[in-house]
Amino acid sequence: MTKVSVDDEFIKFSYSSPMIRSCLLDAGCLLELHTYYTREESGRYSDCRVGVHIDWDGVINGQEIDVENEIDVMLLEGVVPVFISCKNGRVNQMALYELDAVANRFGGKYVRKELAATQEITPGYLKRAEEMGIVVCMEK
């Protein structure tokens, strides 16, 4: 932040760039970046990407609305794809089903699925994740 000023009623400041502003205002963005950097720095992965958009039919439809999903963090460990969904709030059933559906459709037979979460997950959702082959990672 730049141009910080404080008085009795207000704290005023400017962001150093639009990207920094976006990251600081979107808590999910920070979790995605944290997850990305920790995985990338591990050295286990040959490729690491954040915010990957996947087009379900692979056809570019111009201006028309197309069915897309975003994978928060996508990795390759050798030839094994790893799909990671980051949840900064409560994890619900839809989060698990979306990760499972997208990873199974585009990841192939050996895909690995991870859910990076910041809040505790209920035992029922943890069991469901285990049944779906989703590894839950608690991020701090």
Regions found by a protein language model. Give the residues of each.
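Intrinsically disordered, low-complexity Ser/Thr/Pro/Gly-rich regulatory segments
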Residues: 1-140
